[in-house]
């Protein structure tokens, strides 16, 4: 499940094996893309780099010891680090 949440101006997805929701704000995508993206741009970038986003979410869950149902967000730094590892 990946959706654009216009109420919070963020992309939301369910990390594997986690009951909470992970969000990535449009401003994080702005840093990643180097321009202010549309929601469609954000979804396209997520789709093209889904493995890295999911890896970043898993790393944050582990690093922070998040509860199984905790909601959380990824920053552009979280995603950039995961993209570097995924390549």
For every predicted segment, state its role.
Residues 1-18:
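Short, charged/polar N-terminal "headpieces" of proteins
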Residues 11, 22, 72:
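A broad, low-specificity signal marking well-ordered, structured residues that form hydrophobic/aromatic
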Residues 16-33:
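Short N-terminal mixed-charge amphipathic segments
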Residues 39-87:
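Acidic, low-complexity intrinsically disordered segments
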């Amino acid at each position: 499940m990946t959706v654009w949440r216009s109420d919070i101006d963020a992309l939301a997805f369910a990390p594997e094996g986690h009951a909470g929701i992970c969000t990535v704000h449009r401003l994080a995508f702005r840093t990643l893309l180097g321009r202010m993206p549309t929601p469609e741009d954000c979804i396209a970038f997520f789709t093209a780099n889904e493995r890295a986003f999911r890896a970043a979410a898993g790393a944050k869950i582990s690093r922070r010891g998040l509860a199984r149902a905790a909601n959380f967000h990824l920053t552009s730094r979280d995603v950039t680090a995961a993209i570097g590892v995924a390549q």
